Protein backbone atom coordinates (compact mmCIF):
# COMPACT_ATOMS: atom_id res chain seq x y z
CA UNK A 1 0.00 0.00 0.00
CA UNK A 2 2.80 2.43 0.90
CA UNK A 3 4.61 1.74 -2.39
CA UNK A 4 1.36 2.35 -4.30
CA UNK A 5 0.85 5.66 -2.53
CA UNK A 6 4.45 6.64 -3.28
CA UNK A 7 3.95 5.92 -6.99
CA UNK A 8 0.71 7.87 -6.99
CA UNK A 9 2.41 10.77 -5.28
CA UNK A 10 5.05 10.87 -8.00
CA UNK A 11 2.26 11.16 -10.54
CA UNK A 12 1.05 14.48 -9.09
CA UNK A 13 4.47 16.13 -8.92
CA UNK A 14 4.28 18.02 -12.21
CA UNK A 15 3.43 21.17 -10.28
CA UNK A 16 5.57 20.60 -7.21
CA UNK A 17 9.04 19.13 -7.04
CA UNK A 18 12.43 19.69 -5.48
CA UNK A 19 13.70 22.93 -6.98
CA UNK A 20 17.09 24.45 -7.56
CA UNK A 21 17.77 28.17 -8.14
CA UNK A 22 17.05 29.29 -11.72
CA UNK A 23 19.81 30.48 -14.04
CA UNK A 24 19.90 34.29 -14.34
CA UNK A 25 18.54 34.22 -17.91
CA UNK A 26 15.75 31.71 -17.28
CA UNK A 27 12.97 34.32 -16.80
CA UNK A 28 11.62 32.55 -13.75
CA UNK A 29 11.93 29.01 -15.10
CA UNK A 30 13.45 26.44 -12.74
CA UNK A 31 14.69 22.86 -13.09
CA UNK A 32 12.71 20.52 -10.85
CA UNK A 33 13.75 17.07 -9.71
CA UNK A 34 11.39 14.16 -9.09
CA UNK A 35 12.27 12.02 -6.04
CA UNK A 36 14.20 8.90 -7.01
CA UNK A 37 14.49 9.87 -10.70
CA UNK A 38 17.56 10.71 -12.76
CA UNK A 39 17.54 14.25 -14.13
CA UNK A 40 16.61 15.17 -17.68
CA UNK A 41 19.12 17.80 -18.84
CA UNK A 42 17.68 21.17 -19.87
CA UNK A 43 19.75 23.92 -21.51
CA UNK A 44 19.08 27.14 -23.46
CA UNK A 45 20.16 27.01 -27.09
CA UNK A 46 18.88 27.52 -30.65
CA UNK A 47 17.29 25.03 -33.03
CA UNK A 48 16.86 25.75 -36.74
CA UNK A 49 17.20 29.47 -36.11
CA UNK A 50 14.78 29.62 -33.18
CA UNK A 51 15.58 30.18 -29.49
CA UNK A 52 14.88 26.93 -27.69
CA UNK A 53 15.16 24.95 -24.50
CA UNK A 54 16.87 21.64 -25.26
CA UNK A 55 15.78 18.60 -23.22
CA UNK A 56 17.92 15.45 -23.22
CA UNK A 57 16.55 12.43 -21.37
CA UNK A 58 18.50 9.24 -20.72
CA UNK A 59 16.29 6.93 -18.65
CA UNK A 60 15.37 10.07 -16.73
CA UNK A 61 12.44 12.27 -15.70
CA UNK A 62 12.50 15.84 -14.44
CA UNK A 63 10.69 19.10 -15.13
CA UNK A 64 11.41 22.68 -16.19
CA UNK A 65 8.76 24.88 -14.55
CA UNK A 66 7.70 28.49 -14.13
CA UNK A 67 5.41 29.56 -11.32
CA UNK A 68 2.72 32.12 -12.13
CA UNK A 69 0.90 34.68 -10.03
CA UNK A 70 -2.68 33.31 -10.11
CA UNK A 71 -4.38 36.68 -9.62
CA UNK A 72 -2.48 38.15 -12.57
CA UNK A 73 -2.70 35.15 -14.92
CA UNK A 74 -6.16 34.53 -16.37
CA UNK A 75 -6.79 31.22 -18.10
CA UNK A 76 -6.65 31.97 -21.81
CA UNK A 77 -5.08 30.81 -25.08
CA UNK A 78 -1.58 29.39 -25.11
CA UNK A 79 1.02 29.08 -27.85
CA UNK A 80 3.88 26.58 -27.72
CA UNK A 81 6.14 24.66 -30.07
CA UNK A 82 8.45 21.67 -29.99
CA UNK A 83 10.95 19.83 -32.18
CA UNK A 84 11.32 16.10 -31.47
CA UNK A 85 14.23 14.03 -32.72
CA UNK A 86 12.83 10.51 -32.23
CA UNK A 87 10.14 8.58 -30.40
CA UNK A 88 10.67 6.28 -27.42
CA UNK A 89 10.01 2.62 -28.32
CA UNK A 90 7.11 1.26 -26.28
CA UNK A 91 6.10 4.59 -24.73
CA UNK A 92 2.37 5.17 -24.21
CA UNK A 93 0.98 7.94 -22.00
CA UNK A 94 -2.09 5.84 -21.15
CA UNK A 95 -0.20 2.84 -19.70
CA UNK A 96 1.19 2.83 -16.15
CA UNK A 97 4.40 0.94 -16.91
CA UNK A 98 5.16 2.74 -20.20
CA UNK A 99 4.07 6.29 -19.35
CA UNK A 100 6.81 8.39 -20.98
CA UNK A 101 6.46 11.28 -23.43
CA UNK A 102 9.06 12.86 -25.70
CA UNK A 103 7.30 16.21 -25.24
CA UNK A 104 4.90 17.64 -22.68
CA UNK A 105 3.71 21.16 -21.96
CA UNK A 106 2.09 21.24 -18.53
CA UNK A 107 -0.27 23.63 -16.73
CA UNK A 108 -1.10 23.54 -13.01
CA UNK A 109 -4.42 24.94 -11.74
CA UNK A 110 -5.63 25.87 -8.29
CA UNK A 111 -8.91 24.76 -6.73
CA UNK A 112 -10.61 23.45 -3.61
CA UNK A 113 -8.49 20.45 -2.64
CA UNK A 114 -10.77 19.75 0.36
CA UNK A 115 -13.53 18.89 -2.12
CA UNK A 116 -11.55 15.96 -3.54
CA UNK A 117 -12.01 12.32 -2.42
CA UNK A 118 -10.04 11.21 0.64
CA UNK A 119 -7.78 8.89 -1.38
CA UNK A 120 -6.81 11.76 -3.67
CA UNK A 121 -6.11 14.02 -0.69
CA UNK A 122 -3.85 11.29 0.74
CA UNK A 123 -1.82 11.29 -2.48
CA UNK A 124 -1.55 15.07 -2.31
CA UNK A 125 -0.42 14.96 1.32
CA UNK A 126 2.27 12.41 0.49
CA UNK A 127 3.43 14.48 -2.48
CA UNK A 128 3.69 17.51 -0.22
CA UNK A 129 5.64 15.51 2.37
CA UNK A 130 8.10 14.37 -0.32
CA UNK A 131 8.63 17.79 -1.89
CA UNK A 132 7.72 20.45 0.64
CA UNK A 133 4.96 22.02 -1.46
CA UNK A 134 1.38 21.14 -2.32
CA UNK A 135 0.60 19.87 -5.83
CA UNK A 136 -1.91 21.69 -8.05
CA UNK A 137 -5.59 20.95 -7.70
CA UNK A 138 -5.55 19.88 -11.36
CA UNK A 139 -2.84 19.42 -13.97
CA UNK A 140 -3.42 19.55 -17.74
CA UNK A 141 -0.75 18.28 -20.12
CA UNK A 142 -0.37 18.60 -23.88
CA UNK A 143 1.66 15.62 -25.08
CA UNK A 144 3.24 13.95 -28.09
CA UNK A 145 2.47 10.22 -27.96
CA UNK A 146 3.86 7.41 -30.06
CA UNK A 147 0.51 5.94 -31.17
CA UNK A 148 -2.60 7.49 -29.59
CA UNK A 149 -4.68 9.57 -32.03
CA UNK A 150 -4.48 13.35 -31.92
CA UNK A 151 -7.32 14.66 -29.76
CA UNK A 152 -7.28 11.72 -27.35
CA UNK A 153 -7.88 12.73 -23.73
CA UNK A 154 -6.04 10.50 -21.26
CA UNK A 155 -6.72 10.30 -17.54
CA UNK A 156 -3.44 9.61 -15.77
CA UNK A 157 -3.50 5.97 -14.63
CA UNK A 158 -2.19 6.88 -11.16
CA UNK A 159 -3.99 10.17 -10.49
CA UNK A 160 -7.21 11.40 -12.05
CA UNK A 161 -6.17 14.97 -11.18
CA UNK A 162 -3.79 14.79 -14.14
CA UNK A 163 -5.32 14.73 -17.64
CA UNK A 164 -3.47 14.72 -20.96
CA UNK A 165 -4.48 15.81 -24.43
CA UNK A 166 -2.58 14.30 -27.37
CA UNK A 167 -1.70 17.08 -29.83
CA UNK A 168 0.95 15.22 -31.87
CA UNK A 169 1.24 11.50 -32.53
CA UNK A 170 3.53 9.07 -34.27
CA UNK A 171 6.66 9.67 -36.36
CA UNK A 172 5.29 11.66 -39.32
CA UNK A 173 6.16 15.11 -37.94
CA UNK A 174 9.51 14.28 -36.33
CA UNK A 175 12.58 16.49 -36.86
CA UNK A 176 10.67 19.67 -37.65
CA UNK A 177 9.12 22.44 -35.59
CA UNK A 178 5.51 21.81 -34.59
CA UNK A 179 3.60 24.96 -33.60
CA UNK A 180 0.46 24.76 -31.49
CA UNK A 181 -2.16 27.26 -30.36
CA UNK A 182 -4.75 26.04 -27.85
CA UNK A 183 -7.71 27.43 -25.94
CA UNK A 184 -6.55 26.46 -22.46
CA UNK A 185 -9.90 27.03 -20.74
CA UNK A 186 -11.81 25.01 -23.35
CA UNK A 187 -9.28 22.19 -23.17
CA UNK A 188 -9.55 22.13 -19.37
CA UNK A 189 -13.32 21.82 -19.61
CA UNK A 190 -12.92 19.04 -22.18
CA UNK A 191 -10.47 17.11 -20.00
CA UNK A 192 -11.98 17.65 -16.54
CA UNK A 193 -15.63 18.48 -17.19
CA UNK A 194 -15.48 21.58 -14.98
CA UNK A 195 -14.38 25.20 -15.13
CA UNK A 196 -10.66 25.85 -14.59
CA UNK A 197 -9.42 27.43 -11.40
CA UNK A 198 -6.58 29.97 -11.27
CA UNK A 199 -3.53 29.16 -13.36
CA UNK A 200 -0.58 28.55 -11.01
CA UNK A 201 2.28 27.19 -13.11
CA UNK A 202 3.44 26.09 -16.54
CA UNK A 203 6.17 23.60 -17.33
CA UNK A 204 7.76 21.38 -19.94
CA UNK A 205 8.87 17.80 -19.42
CA UNK A 206 10.66 15.15 -21.45
CA UNK A 207 10.97 11.75 -19.77
CA UNK A 208 12.11 8.26 -20.73
CA UNK A 209 12.56 6.50 -17.38
CA UNK A 210 9.67 4.03 -17.50
CA UNK A 211 10.79 2.54 -20.82
CA UNK A 212 14.50 2.85 -20.00
CA UNK A 213 14.98 4.74 -23.24
CA UNK A 214 16.16 8.14 -24.41
CA UNK A 215 14.65 11.28 -25.90
CA UNK A 216 15.85 14.62 -27.24
CA UNK A 217 13.44 17.51 -27.70
CA UNK A 218 13.66 21.27 -28.24
CA UNK A 219 10.93 23.55 -26.84
CA UNK A 220 10.09 27.01 -28.10
CA UNK A 221 8.62 29.69 -25.80
CA UNK A 222 5.40 28.88 -23.96
CA UNK A 223 3.29 32.03 -24.29
CA UNK A 224 -0.10 32.97 -22.85
CA UNK A 225 -2.22 35.23 -25.08
Residue ranges and their predicted role:
Residues 202, 221-224:
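Extracellular beta-strand elements of beta-rich domains used
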Residues 105, 160-170, 174-212:
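Extracellular beta-strand ligand-recognition surfaces/modules
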Residues 67-78, 171-174:
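Extracellular/lumenal carbohydrate-interaction signature centered on repeated Trp-anchored short motifs
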Residues 2-10:
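Sec-dependent signal peptide recognition
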Amino acid sequence: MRRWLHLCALAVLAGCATSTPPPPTADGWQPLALPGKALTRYSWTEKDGRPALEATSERSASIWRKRLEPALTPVREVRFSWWVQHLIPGANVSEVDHEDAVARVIFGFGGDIDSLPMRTRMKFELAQALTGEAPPYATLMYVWDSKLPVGTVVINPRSDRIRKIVVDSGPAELRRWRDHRRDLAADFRLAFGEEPGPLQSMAVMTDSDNNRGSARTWYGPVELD
